[in-house]
């Protein structure tokens, strides 16, 4: 996986690299699908750890497959998400395809959540529905401090 890959940043309305969005160090990348239970569960699962993720200070880049998916997402349904989230879309699904191929995933189900660093080392991956994902991510980032 390459942190130099581009995505479309929904706030700035520009293409940028994951590295430019996250700065050096570790980050969370979540390749998500709107209005799907596994993605909804993931978002609800990280909300209780909002303060911990904000204290960690690293970015969480959440990417939809394309603009139409981003438009269907109801952000207002998810209160109390960390302010370190960068919302975007995956340009030509480059990021998803690289993670899918390089991590040898066998199912194209979203969400796919990774914790990686800007030297392209993935230290955590989860795909699909996973109970306690917020806690798992919190445990991983605490070990990285």
At which residue positions do the language-model features occur?
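Extracellular/periplasmic catalytic domains that process cell-envelope and extracellular macromolecules
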Residues: 20-23, 54-55, 79-81, 105-108
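A short beta-strand-turn-helix
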Residues: 1-27, 34, 44-48
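Hydrophobic beta-strand anchors of alpha/beta hydrolase catalytic cores
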Residues: 28-29, 113
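Active-site-proximal beta-strand/loop segments in catalytic clefts of secreted hydrolases
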Residues: 31-34, 63-66, 90-91, 117, ...
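Short acidic-hydrophobic, aromatic-tinged amphipathic segments that line or gate anion-handling sites
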Residues: 9-11, 84-95, 126
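Structural microenvironment flanking redox-active thiols in thiol-disulfide oxidoreductases
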Residues: 35-82, 93-100
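Structural micro-motif
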Residues: 82-86, 102-114
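Thiol-/selenol-based redox modules, centered on thioredoxin-like
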Residues: 108-145
């Amino acid at each position: 996986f390459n942190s130099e890959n581009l995505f479309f940043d929904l706030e700035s309305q520009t293409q940028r690299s994951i590295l430019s969005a996250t700065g050096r160090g570790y980050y969370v990348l979540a390749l998500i699908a709107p209005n799907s239970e596994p993605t909804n569960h993931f978002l609800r699962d990280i909300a209780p750890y909002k303060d911990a993720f904000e204290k960690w200070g690293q970015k969480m880049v959440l990417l939809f497959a394309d603009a139409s998916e981003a438009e269907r997402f109801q952000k207002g349904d998810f209160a109390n998400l960390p302010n370190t989230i960068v919302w975007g879309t995956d340009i030509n699904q480059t990021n998803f395809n690289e993670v899918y191929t390089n991590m040898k995933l066998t199912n194209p189900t979203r969400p796919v959540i990774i914790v990686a660093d800007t030297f392209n080392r993935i230290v955590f991956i989860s795909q699909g529905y996973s109970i306690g994902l917020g806690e798992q991510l919190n445990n991983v980032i605490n070990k990285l401090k």
